[in-house]
Structure formats: C-alpha cells, structure tokens
C-alpha cells in the first residue's frame, strides 16, 4: 500500500511505519508481541515492552504512547496477567510514555506486547536502507539471548548467566537512540528475531551495499559460547542460519558455532548503527557517556561488485 504521506512502509523491511501529518510532524507506528521467554511474569512484561519500544528507538524517533496487546488463557490465574502488565507499565514509565489502553483475547498461551506510537520530524527518521560504502557498523548490546533463554527453558543454564541476559533484554534502547540522534547516522535497525546477520542483510539489501563483519569484535553475552559448545541452539536461530547461508561468505576460520551465534534470534537486542567513519569516534563516545551496554565497531560497509556476497564474515 502506498500513500503520499506514508514516508516509510513495508518496502524496505524497516522497523516501523512513518506517516507524515504535517511539515514538521510525523507519527511512527509499530506493534510487537510474543509468548513468555522467561518464567517470571513481571520480568516477561518488562522484556516484551522493551522489545516493542525498540522499533521506535531504531527509527530515531520518540515514543509517546502505547496500547497493550494481550493473549491469555482463561484457566490461568489473573494475577499472572496483572504482573505481566505491571512489568510492561514499569518500562513505559522508564521510557516516559503512557499506556492508554489495549486489547485482549483468550489464547492457549500467554502473549504480550505493545502497539507503540512515536513522533519524529518528517525526513529525520533513521531508516535501515541508507547505509553508505565506507560506513562503520556499531552494535549497542551483546548477542546471545536466544541461546541463553533456550538453555533456561531446558534448565541447563547457570542462574547468573540467565540473570545477566534478562537484564540485557529488559534494558531500553532509549539512551542508545538519543546518542545516535545527537551524532547523526546513516542507517539503523534493532537486532531481534532475525539475528545480527539477518537484520544486517536487510540493511545491506535495502541500501544496495555489502558488509564485512569481524566475528572477534562482536560482543557476546558471557556464557553463550559455553552453551553453544553443549549443543544448545534455538530452532529459530537454525532457521536464520539456513536462510542466510546463500548470502554470506564465511571465512575459513569461522566455526559452525560462530555461524550459529551470529544468526542467533535475539529478543530486545541492541541497535545496529551504520555511521560515517568520520563520525564513528563521536558516536562511540556518545554511546559510552549514555551508558549503553556496548559501543563496539563490529564491521564495515562496502560497495559490492556483481559476484560479491551481501555479507562477508571473517575472524
């Protein structure tokens, strides 16, 4: 669907839609929800809300309001739903937005998320399809949440490893987005279900560019690689790897577990930012001052020739 005021739609697989209301105001619209990935209902609510808000932050926009989206079994204690909603409300408060209402349906398993509305100056949104050759790629959170939460469901993960992953997932991308806006960058996406390489592929295909990723520079949540060595890999992660293989050139030094890790399906992951190399130091400094979990440069963008892969991963 197209419309003169629809500035960002589905064409480039962007994180949210952007609709122009006036010369100096556009709304940013997104929705996301999913079943629990942790046992504690309050924590699940926090993670789901942070994940939903992330799409607006990735667009370089300011969230202002949200609606709850709920699926809940009729035979479960309603106090569980109350805790989920409290968790979501706590993140909304932290983000400085209101939850103005919502909608619920009876479902076989709990599901929760937010429909988020944000605002941005038309033309100032940060899309995922404007990477430039020579740009550096910066990641604001470590990866590994898919592997760790899967291990948690199997009761095969150290409690401290899981706790750390939960804290990372519940962390808003608010300050990372504000730092990105203050510097001015070329493109951005948040890293979620398609994994680091999946979202990078969307950025590169939308921009008509290619990317070189340095595996050794990608920040990883402590304990993730030990779990991979135990053979723990989420189904979604393995589907990501299967989908990505035709468009990725893997360096000879890249092991199978490295491939799985770089394709690991994330929940409430960090921002993957494509920035002009002349602004990279300033961006890293701003991210550090904002207290983000990572400000690591993980790769670079290049202009591919006809036979080049979309993504080249080296050690």
Predicted regions mapped to residue ranges:
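N-terminal glycine-rich anion-binding loops that anchor highly charged ligand groups
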Residues: 3, 7-29, 57-62
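A generic local secondary-structure boundary/capping motif
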Residues: 6-8, 16-19, 55-57, 89, ...
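Glycine-rich anion-binding loops of enzyme active sites
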Residues: 21-38, 43, 62-158, 299-302
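A structural signal for small-residue-enriched, beta-sheet-centric alpha/beta enzyme cores
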Residues: 137, 143-144, 188-193, 203
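Acidic-glycine-rich active-site phosphate/pyrophosphate-binding loop
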Residues: 17-28, 170-176, 241-252
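Active-site glycine-rich loop that binds ribose-phosphate moieties when present
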Residues: 115-124, 160-180, 254-255
């Amino acid at each position: 669907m197209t419309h003169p005021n629809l500035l960002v739609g589905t064409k480039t697989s962007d994180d949210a839609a952007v609709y122009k209301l006036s010369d100096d105001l556009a709304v940013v619209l997104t929705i996301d929800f999913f079943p629990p990935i942790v046992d504690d209902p309050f924590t699940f609510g926090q993670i789901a809300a942070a994940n939903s808000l992330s799409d607006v932050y990735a667009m370089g926009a300011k969230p202002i309001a949200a609606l709850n989206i709920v699926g809940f079994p009729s035979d479960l204690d309603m106090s569980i739903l109350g805790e989920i909603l409290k968790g979501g409300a706590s993140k909304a408060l932290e983000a400085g937005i209101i939850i103005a209402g919502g909608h619920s349906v009876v479902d076989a398993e709990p599901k929760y998320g937010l429909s988020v509305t944000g605002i941005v100056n038309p033309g100032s949104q940060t899309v995922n399809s404007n990477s430039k050759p020579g740009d550096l790629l910066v990641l604001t959170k470590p990866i590994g949440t898919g592997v760790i939460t899967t291990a948690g469901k199997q009761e095969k993960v150290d409690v401290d490893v899981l706790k750390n992953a939960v804290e990372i997932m519940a962390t808003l991308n608010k300050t990372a987005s504000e730092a990105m806006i203050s510097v001015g960058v070329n493109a951005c996406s948040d890293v979620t279900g398609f994994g680091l390489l999946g979202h990078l592929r969307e950025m590169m295909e939308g921009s008509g560019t290619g990317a070189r990723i340095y595996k050794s520079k990608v920040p990883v949540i402590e304990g993730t690689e030990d779990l991979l060595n135990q053979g723990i890999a989420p189904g979604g992660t393995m589907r990501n790897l299967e989908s990505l293989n035709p468009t990725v050139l893997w360096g000879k030094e890249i092991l199978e577990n490295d491939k799985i890790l770089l394709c690991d399906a994330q929940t409430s992951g960090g921002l993957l930012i494509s920035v002009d190399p002349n602004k990279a130091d300033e961006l890293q400094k701003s991210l550090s001052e904002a207290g983000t979990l990572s400000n690591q440069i993980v790769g670079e963008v290049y202009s591919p020739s006809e036979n080049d892969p979309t993504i080249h991963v080296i050690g």
